């Protein structure tokens, strides 16, 4: 089997596929100016195009697919997409990242279709603070989705919270207590600077090392990562059912173990979340006979992948916001 690899000795077995660039939340760290979409942008990838895309990437060694947005549950054909992705031989894991606003009543169907992992965005466990961060009053709906996911015993269930110095870090102990009796993982993501959130970033950034130092002092132990795992370093504790984690893109050598590629909701391959430029794959997603051309295009494009991003130099590439590419 072919294994995708770049010039920096990194292998890629994990694909993040955005299903839409539209989001119905207005998180200050992502869309501080609201969402401004180009009305002339191409149509979203269709189900047949998605199927051809996944089959091609599996032939290149991809084992895990994460469906992101924007907000992927805004797609009415989401269950069909999950089913199509899960049905491709070679796919070991189908994951979904969602804000949970309209997820509770769809989870059973998604699980039956082949969903094996859910990452739920939840930046606060307090309704008022949640609304202040996200611009949404759907806190109860998100919590209901989380409890439903626990009840359904999804194989992997994680909560993502963007680490914010004044808005949720003071409530860190609430998150830690939340996993005491719940078999979930809560991961804190360092706030990342984009072209749109400069002021917000300056006010709210906090290094993830602040959290890990506390956790290690409290007896939390690091867990070895799977080869298809994302960038989080997770920690376990004998007195807690759940886990804690940190995604720290500003830490040294963050990119040296990169194992994932991104395809936008319009079919463009993006080599780095904070890079520049995209490579259109859509012309090779129209028919199975184009498979060899698709594989060749992906392999050629991978030669342009750089060793790492330049966030530490305040260079966000051409990333205006995270909703466009799914974070």
UniProtKB/Swiss-Prot annotation:
<protein>
    <recommendedName>
        <fullName>GTP 3',8-cyclase</fullName>
        <ecNumber>4.1.99.22</ecNumber>
    </recommendedName>
</protein>
<dbReference type="GO" id="GO:0005525">
    <property type="term" value="F:GTP binding"/>
</dbReference>
<dbReference type="InterPro" id="IPR010505">
    <property type="entry name" value="MoaA_twitch"/>
</dbReference>
<dbReference type="Pfam" id="PF06463">
    <property type="entry name" value="Mob_synth_C"/>
</dbReference>
<feature type="binding site">
    <location>
        <position position="192"/>
    </location>
    <ligand>
        <name>S-adenosyl-L-methionine</name>
    </ligand>
</feature>
<feature type="binding site">
    <location>
        <position position="66"/>
    </location>
    <ligand>
        <name>GTP</name>
    </ligand>
</feature>
<keyword id="KW-0949">S-adenosyl-L-methionine</keyword>
<feature type="domain" description="Radical SAM core">
    <location>
        <begin position="7"/>
        <end position="232"/>
    </location>
</feature>
<feature type="binding site">
    <location>
        <position position="272"/>
    </location>
    <ligand>
        <name>[4Fe-4S] cluster 2</name>
    </ligand>
</feature>
<keyword id="KW-0479">Metal-binding</keyword>
<dbReference type="GO" id="GO:1904047">
    <property type="term" value="F:S-adenosyl-L-methionine binding"/>
</dbReference>
<dbReference type="InterPro" id="IPR006638">
    <property type="entry name" value="Elp3/MiaA/NifB-like_rSAM"/>
</dbReference>
<keyword id="KW-0408">Iron</keyword>
<feature type="binding site">
    <location>
        <position position="29"/>
    </location>
    <ligand>
        <name>S-adenosyl-L-methionine</name>
    </ligand>
</feature>
<comment type="similarity">
    <text>Belongs to the radical SAM superfamily. MoaA family.</text>
</comment>
<keyword id="KW-0547">Nucleotide-binding</keyword>
<feature type="binding site">
    <location>
        <position position="255"/>
    </location>
    <ligand>
        <name>[4Fe-4S] cluster 2</name>
    </ligand>
</feature>
<dbReference type="InterPro" id="IPR013483">
    <property type="entry name" value="MoaA"/>
</dbReference>
<feature type="binding site">
    <location>
        <position position="158"/>
    </location>
    <ligand>
        <name>GTP</name>
    </ligand>
</feature>
<feature type="binding site">
    <location>
        <position position="258"/>
    </location>
    <ligand>
        <name>[4Fe-4S] cluster 2</name>
    </ligand>
</feature>
<dbReference type="Pfam" id="PF04055">
    <property type="entry name" value="Radical_SAM"/>
</dbReference>
<dbReference type="GO" id="GO:0051539">
    <property type="term" value="F:4 iron, 4 sulfur cluster binding"/>
</dbReference>
<keyword id="KW-0411">Iron-sulfur</keyword>
<feature type="binding site">
    <location>
        <position position="30"/>
    </location>
    <ligand>
        <name>[4Fe-4S] cluster 1</name>
    </ligand>
</feature>
<keyword id="KW-0342">GTP-binding</keyword>
<feature type="binding site">
    <location>
        <position position="97"/>
    </location>
    <ligand>
        <name>GTP</name>
    </ligand>
</feature>
<keyword id="KW-0004">4Fe-4S</keyword>
<dbReference type="InterPro" id="IPR007197">
    <property type="entry name" value="rSAM"/>
</dbReference>
<feature type="binding site">
    <location>
        <position position="27"/>
    </location>
    <ligand>
        <name>[4Fe-4S] cluster 1</name>
    </ligand>
</feature>
<feature type="binding site">
    <location>
        <position position="23"/>
    </location>
    <ligand>
        <name>[4Fe-4S] cluster 1</name>
    </ligand>
</feature>
<comment type="subunit">
    <text>Monomer and homodimer.</text>
</comment>
<dbReference type="InterPro" id="IPR050105">
    <property type="entry name" value="MoCo_biosynth_MoaA/MoaC"/>
</dbReference>
<dbReference type="InterPro" id="IPR013785">
    <property type="entry name" value="Aldolase_TIM"/>
</dbReference>
<comment type="function">
    <text>Catalyzes the cyclization of GTP to (8S)-3',8-cyclo-7,8-dihydroguanosine 5'-triphosphate.</text>
</comment>
<keyword id="KW-0501">Molybdenum cofactor biosynthesis</keyword>
<dbReference type="GO" id="GO:0061799">
    <property type="term" value="F:cyclic pyranopterin monophosphate synthase activity"/>
</dbReference>
<dbReference type="InterPro" id="IPR000385">
    <property type="entry name" value="MoaA_NifB_PqqE_Fe-S-bd_CS"/>
</dbReference>
<dbReference type="GO" id="GO:0061798">
    <property type="term" value="F:GTP 3',8'-cyclase activity"/>
</dbReference>
<keyword id="KW-0456">Lyase</keyword>
<comment type="pathway">
    <text>Cofactor biosynthesis; molybdopterin biosynthesis.</text>
</comment>
<feature type="binding site">
    <location>
        <position position="16"/>
    </location>
    <ligand>
        <name>GTP</name>
    </ligand>
</feature>
<feature type="binding site">
    <location>
        <begin position="260"/>
        <end position="262"/>
    </location>
    <ligand>
        <name>GTP</name>
    </ligand>
</feature>
